[in-house]
Amino acid sequence: MERSKGAILVLSGPSGSGKSSLCKTLFKEIKNAYFSVSTTTRTPREGEIEGKHYHFVSKEKFLEGIEENFFLEWAEVHGNYYGTSKESVESALAQGKLVVFDIDIQGHRNIKESYPELTTSVFITTPTQQELRERLVLRGTDDKETIDLRVMHAYTEMKHIKEFDFVIVNRDLKESEKLLLSIARAALSKRILYDVESLVARWKSKETPKTPNSQ
């Protein structure tokens, strides 16, 4: 039976915890997954593509979107604005897709408040703060000051782990991929996603097998 609506999977956690790498596997395996492309005011990193990784806009344009109630959720992080379009999310849910968000703690709260029954959330982290810092250095996209800021922000994020449904400590990428895929498939199997009355009616319409006692 087809789902009557889609589901939401929220991924949060410190920058450098491996969310992007895990997402790549998720989208290879879950064919009807839809990545919610955020709008941001930050400068594009090398290799990032407009419309694929982010929608890049000016601060003025973003603030206009806030005024026009364009965003489902938005937040200011490290001096930059990030937000999610309402229209694109509603459209994907109507098509029965798994809508995947890579957003911060406040964004998770906003999504959970808007779609409490459809949302499954996962907090992804490294085993230690030191490993997080090492990954950020190896990534080579930020200077020391920015890395220090990201690690400091990670301390704040770690305090909110209890707000999430699942936690993945990303020690081993392959094992973490398996965990995330299991969670994603479970999210798509929630009872709330199905028209239960139609399911039961269809089940009842089938001929009931006779048992020895019914003869």
UniProtKB/Swiss-Prot annotation:
Domain Guanylate kinase-like stretches: 6-185
Catalytic activity: GMP + ATP = GDP + ADP
An example molecular function term from Gene Ontology annotations: ATP binding
Record-annotated membrane-spanning stretches: none
Location of the protein in the cell: Cytoplasm
Protein residues bound to ATP: 13-20
Keywords tagged on the record: ATP-binding, Cytoplasm, Kinase, Nucleotide-binding, Transferase
Predominant location: cytoplasm
Pfam families attached to this UniProt entry: Guanylate_kin
Cellular component annotations (GO), alphabetically ordered: cytosol
EC number(s) on file: 2.7.4.8
Function: Essential for recycling GMP and indirectly, cGMP.
Family: Belongs to the guanylate kinase family.
HAMAP family named in the record: Guanylate_kinase
PANTHER family: GUANYLATE KINASE, GUANYLATE KINASE-RELATED
Designated name of the protein: Guanylate kinase
Organism: Wolinella succinogenes (strain ATCC 29543 / DSM 1740 / CCUG 13145 / JCM 31913 / LMG 7466 / NCTC 11488 / FDC 602W)
Higher taxonomy: Bacteria, Pseudomonadati, Campylobacterota, Epsilonproteobacteria, Campylobacterales
